[in-house]
Amino acid sequence: MNLLSGLEKFGLKGDGELNILNDGTDTRKRQETRTKQEPVELTEKDFLLDRKVKCPICDKEFVVKTVKSSKMKRLEPDADLRPNHEYVDTLKYGVCACPSCGYAAMRRNFDHLSATQRKWIREQISANFKPVEEPKMETYTYDYAVEKYKLALVSAMAKKAKLSEKAYICLNIAWLRRAEMKTIPNDTPVNKKRLENCQKEYEGFYRQAYDGFIKVTSTEMPPYNGMDANTVDYILANMAVHYKDYDVASKLISRLITSAATSRRMKDKCLELKEQVVAELKANVN
């Protein structure tokens, strides 16, 4: 018998078995257990937040997306030390670009401008810049991110930045295009064209970065845009293997292996890279 029958007319549920000893604890426990058992599906947007930035050129504020670094889980980097993280490609969010005046730079360099550099930016960038409406997006696309890095590169050239800064921007663009290629299926003419364009940009900017950092190591003192000498040498060694510059790669590897400042982990990686160089040289002979 339903002891609570008749309550329906008041809009209240009168069905179910009456048990005044049940205070709802059992129901809450079942709900909590179900919640714990259901995994939370995290996506890229869960690791981002909006942050206001003030442009040092035009003094206008704008919003950029930034990564919640405390929540990031590092994954194994690529052979050339391109950083990888779970759920989000942090490199996409490495540039601040003012939508009003066109000035852009990597975050670590954005506010560091001399009076003369501000003048050069205003004359060479802002005077010719045509603002465009910023798209509303929860996460940055690779094309959008690369666009901002390219703005950072022309700003770096306009302000006569160190070669290490320009080379690092080129390296990041190459890394972004390489990551993008992994997301594009080679199944339609449109996608094949996208892959072809990405490959061209990847190789072009990777070469600029390689040539740039080779010169940087002989013309600048470390750190090179925040990277120590060993890190840059190791990146260059991998890039040299990519371009089959085996003499350059071998010299860099030997220097790293014999250096007391090189970590054990990096020395192990250098030994693996040395084996790769030897194997490729043997393959070329055969």
Stretch-by-stretch model annotation:
Residues 54-59, 98-101:
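Short cysteine-rich clusters marking metal-coordination/redox-active sites
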Residues 165, 201, 205, 221-229, ...:
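Structural signature of alpha-solenoid helical repeat junctions
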Residues 172, 231-238, 242, 268-280:
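"A position-specific structural signal for the A-helix of alpha-solenoid helical repeats
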Residues 124-153, 158-194, 227-239:
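Amphipathic alpha-helical repeat scaffolds of TPR domains
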Residues 60-88:
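Short recognition patches in nucleic-acid-associated and regulatory proteins
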Residues 49-51, 94:
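Short metal-coordination and nucleic-acid-contact micro-motifs, chiefly zinc-binding Cys/His arrays
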